[in-house]
Regions:
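Beta-lactam-recognizing serine transpeptidase/beta-lactamase-like catalytic domain environment
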Residues: 71, 193-204, 251-307, 311-543, ...
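Periplasmic/cell-envelope proteins involved in peptidoglycan metabolism and beta-lactam response
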Residues: 1-275, 301, 323, 376-388, ...
Length: 573
């Protein structure tokens, strides 16, 4: 009996001390949580009681060199619903169908969905948003948002690019400089009860958004308009497939205008242009959207034809294998190995100097010059002049040069390369390389971006683009400027001549592949003033109907552009 009492007493003591120990542990844990983890759990509790809604930040503007706004923002609204706050679901559904023009089935599905916040429609105009707000229905949210707006719509569309539904850049400058243009979104924090219903008489917490920075570019809206008007005119009159125009400063590579016509509508970037309307709603719609957005100035390559003779001549002068006084003879063709390669003048130019050979754009002269340089050295000049590398322009999707391997260049390949066939480069590559030859021999990097500015026009960042000095001698550059001025004043580029101005330039007519298609590219590359170039213009007309010679149809387009931009840039006669 005594043993049982002792046993029970011991059992009670163990239970008592266990309870005391557990209580002490729990109290200690509670004290620890209150003193050291209190803030954390307070925040967690608040998060359970708060609903977040984003406040979209305004995207930075894109400006031309003079501050003209090329891309900005338009205030719009995003309409959302919170299911467990809606008190009159049928009325809400009817109102949203009426105001937003969305099918009832789609609206009902979203209104009846059990989620904390369900978006109904974005990019709703402010007027409609205000009407929806005026209904005063519980559970319907109208939040401020921004939609990208392009004041000039089609102007420089393939350079500027556009943004997607999330307001992030997709192509063009919008994509390349997205990290500078995008802002930081703000937040609206709303207190809710356990059911997720907003608590009355408790204000919202707001974290204001921060707008993106502005991008100032080298584009000039007026020059872009001049170039676009000229491209449009040539496109219609020549019934061409497309027209590309590049206007740049050859001394630093700043692009003042870039047109690839037809352009697309920046404010409706997924709406096919008239030429592609037949593909709307078909399986090929996306393919033709991609074609419409493609910038052939940088994304595509082509055989440059006779404009490349500028580079062949510069390489020959650098190599010392030709002088301005050298004499040649053109019977209308030249035989290289077993290949008879004709001149565009099939009856021949007869006896001519090197200067006259350039004025006449004589193929046999340039084949002779190319053979003098030799395949190995010519390939070295491709490397020296930068032709084997991308230009590095600050636009996406630049294509690479398509060139024979050094060891695969025989005499026939060398002959055709010397007058701009059997290899391909981009238009921007041609414009950049010729700029570098005529500017004294400095290989520039073509670019559009200049600097990033905040809303107060304070410069945040200036972009520097590399320059490679000495790709050719100043003496070579001077001779090339002289030779190309003669092409316009006395040679095949005379249709680009403007009284009172010294303009240098070179014509080209090249055939596309396959040759059997008989499609041609007419082009003209010019610069002014010839003795101290401040502006270079490249015009490319693809597959024009009727006459297709560059000197006949591309040179007048070049002249029209120069007649507008030379006085505008105040370049003296």
């Amino acid at each position: 009996m005594e043993w049982n009492k002792t046993y029970h007493r011991r059992k009670i003591c163990i239970i008592f001390f266990s309870v005391v120990l557990m209580s002490m542990v729990l109290c200690g844990r509670l004290v620890y949580l209150m003193l050291f983890e209190g803030k954390y759990y307070e925040t967690q509790a608040k998060d359970l009681q708060q609903r977040e809604r984003k406040i979209k930040a305004a995207r930075g503007k894109i400006l031309d060199r003079n501050g003209v706004v090329l891309a900005d923002n338009k205030s719009v609204c995003t309409i959302s619903v919170i299911h467990n706050q809606i008190k009159e679901p049928e009325a809400v559904i009817a109102m949203l169908v009426k105001e937003l023009g969305i099918p009832e089935e789609k609206v009902r599905k979203r209104v009846e969905k059990y989620s904390s916040l369900e978006k109904i429609k974005s990019n709703v105009d402010k007027e409609t948003g205000n009407r929806i707000l005026a209904y005063g229905y519980a559970g319907v949210k109208v939040d401020e948002d921004y939609k990208r707006n392009y004041p000039y719509d089609t102007l420089a569309s393939k350079v500027l690019g556009f943004t997607g539904g999330d307001n992030q850049g997709i192509i063009g400058l919008e994509s390349v400089y997205d990290k500078y243009l995008e802002g930081t979104d703000g937040l609206i924090l709303t207190t809710t009860d356990a059911r997720g219903v907003e608590v009355d008489n408790i204000g919202e917490e707001r974290k204001e958004p921060v707008a993106g920075n502005n991008l100032r570019t080298s584009l000039d809206a007026n020059i872009q308009m001049f170039a676009m008007q000229a491209a449009n005119k040539a496109y219609i009159q020549k019934e061409a497939d497309s027209v590309s125009i590049i206007v740049m400063n050859p001394s630093d590579g700043a692009v003042m205008a870039m047109v690839d016509y037809p352009e697309f509508h920046l404010n409706e970037p997924f709406q096919l242009i008239e030429e592609y309307k037949e593909y709307e709603g078909t399986k090929k719609e996306q393919e033709y959207c991609n074609r419409m957005w493609r910038n052939q100035c940088i994304n595509d390559t082509y055989e440059p034809g006779s404009t490349f003779k500028v580079i062949t001549a510069a390489a020959a002068l650098e190599e010392g294998v030709v002088s301005l006084e050298d004499r040649f003879h053109c019977p209308g063709y030249i035989v290289v190995e077993d290949r008879r390669i004709r001149c565009h003048k099939t009856t021949g130019h007869g006896a001519e100097s090197f200067v006259e050979g350039i004025e006449n754009s004589c193929n046999p002269v340039f084949i002779n010059v190319g053979l003098r340089i030799g395949a190995d050295h010519f390939y070295d000049y491709f490397e020296q002049f930068g032709l084997l590398h991308k230009t590095g322009i600050d636009l996406p999707g630049e294509a690479s040069t398509i060139m024979h391997k050094r060891e695969k260049i025989g005499l026939v390949e060398l002959a055709t390369i010397s007058f701009g066939q059997s290899f391909q480069i981009t238009p921007i590559q041609l414009a950049t390389t010729v700029s570098s030859i005529i500017n004294g021999g400095n290989r520039v990097t073509p670019h559009v971006g200049m600097q990033v500015e905040n809303g107060d026009k304070k410069v945040i960042k200036t972009f520097d683009f590399p320059v490679q000095e000495g790709i050719c001698r100043e003496e070579t550059s001077e001779k090339m400027r002289f030779l190309l001025e003669k092409v316009v004043s006395e040679g095949g580029g005379n249709k680009a001549y403007i009284e009172g101005y010294e303009i240098g330039g070179k014509t080209a007519t090249s055939q596309t592949l396959p040759r059997s298609a008989h499609k041609y590219i007419s082009s003209f590359l010019g610069f002014a003033p010839a003795d101290d170039p401040k502006v270079l213009v490249l015009v490319i007309i693809r597959n024009p109907s009727g006459i297709y010679y560059g000197g006949t149809i591309a040179a007048p387009v070049e002249k029209e552009i120069f007649e507008n931009i030379l006085p505008y840039l105040e370049l003296e006669q």
